[in-house]
Amino acid sequence: MLGKTIDELVLGETAEFTKTITEADIILFAGVTGDLNPAHINEEYAKNTFFKTRIAHGILQAGFISAAIGMKLPGPGTIYMKQELNFRAPVHIGDTITARVEVSQIDEEKNRVVLKTTCSNQEGEIVLDGEALVSPPKKPKE
């Protein structure tokens, strides 16, 4: 199954991926990436930060953008080429994060698409935003 090709995409088209952050997500992400920053995994340490509690890794939310791109828009077969990120607010265990991608530019000649990317929490607060450059899948040659 392939995602949408360049000629099937429409400016303003959107897709979302939603996930609630769990303790296991943070511990597994720390283990996979090697990012054992105590702000993420040590509650006693985190109590003394300006967040006052542990926070999720910012890049964990960026992974949700990757899921929206790779599985929904444009979807399977998409090549993720570039991502700019701005971390706007902390994410905590129990927060429900919705990654949203929106087609903002289409370059049919180069088979490139620019996507506006955001992650919002359950309150609608944007916790991360940015822009992605992708190459959508091409139709298989017959």
Residue ranges and their predicted role:
Residues M1-T78, K141-E142:
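Hot-dog-fold acyl-thioester-processing enzymes
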Residues M1-L11, V91-E142:
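HotDog/MaoC-like acyl-thioester-processing domains
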Residues T14-T18, E84, D129-L133:
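Well-ordered beta-strand positions in beta-sheet-rich domains
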Residues G34-D35, A46-K47, I79-M81, N111, ...:
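Short, charged/polar low-complexity linear motifs in solvent-exposed/disordered segments
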Residues M71-D95, A99:
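Mid-chain, well-packed structural core segment of small domains
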Residues F29, N42-E44, I79-Y80, E84-N86, ...:
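A broad, low-amplitude sensor of folded, mature protein cores
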